[in-house]
Structures are given as C-alpha cells and as structure tokens.
Amino acid sequence: MGAGGDKPKTTSHLKTPACPYPIYSNSISDYGLYGYTDAPKIMNESVTVSARGTIGYVCLRHIPYVPIVRLVTLIPNTDILSAKYLYLFLSHRNITGTGTTQQQLTVPDFSKTEIPIPDKQIMTSFTEIVTPFFQQIWANEEENEKLTEVRDTLLPKLMSGELDVSRLDI
C-alpha cells in the first residue's frame, strides 16, 4: 500500500509512443486520468482509492501506470487475494476520511480497513468467474477509445468538406 507521489517530469496530455503510460490522480472524471508519461511506477494489477476531495473513489488498474497526488495504491499479494476481489469489495464500502476542513484518507488510516479473505480455493474460483467480465469491460473501453479517435479524425474532415460523402448510398 502506498500513496501517489509527484507528477513525473516527462508528461503528455495525449497518449504518444514516447508517453504510453497513464498517470492517474484522485479525480473521478475519466477514471482519474491526468495524462501520460514515459515510465510506469506500478506494473501489477492493483486498486486505487482517491484520498482527498472525492474520497473513496475506487478503480481497478490492469495496465502499468503512475499514481500521483493523494491516490492510495493497493497491490494485493495474489497468493492471498486478487485485485478484482479487492476492487469489488472496496467499491461496495463507504470509505471515509478524516479532517474538518478538507477530508482526506491517509495510508495509516486506510490500513486499518478490515478485508474478509476467503480461503484460497474460493478466491481462485471467484477470480476465474469474474475475470472474463473485466476482460470484456476493458475490451469495450479500448474499442471506445479507438472509435473516439476515428470520430475525432473524421468529423473535422466531414465538416470542412475535405471528405465528400455525397455519393454514398446510405
């Protein structure tokens, strides 16, 4: 368990070959995506929890990334429990912080959270059952990204008349 650090030196607002790894912050919009960078800090499937502002926003991360700015990162010991189980458990809890002016969640506070751990066979079966659902979600998200890119490329060309579609039989 750890807290997100400073923003990396090399960043881009767009995903590029030089900056292919997402940077996540404690925001709730766009799953907390802040930008992209050239080197990930977290390589394993993990769970992040926003720790300031919108406290308790839980995300399952399955690709290498960099956590920044008040984002608690949980990398489970996969011999004991899966990130998918941890994500589903935490996403159904009311996670709160401490503080009077601005609520915040600290790693020491969060480490007190009790997580029921089923035996290994049940955990393995559970993970095998839910994995295809997550894989489908991730495939859909990837397809949405590609479709957004196509839309953003084609729409300006259609609007400017650069791409003529008047002869299409629709």
Listing of model-derived features with the role each one plays in the protein:
Residues 79-81, 92, 96-98, 103, ...:
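Amphipathic alpha-helical coiled-coil/heptad-repeat segments
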Residues 1-118, 169:
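DNA target-recognition domains and sequence-specific DNA-contacting regions of bacterial/archaeal
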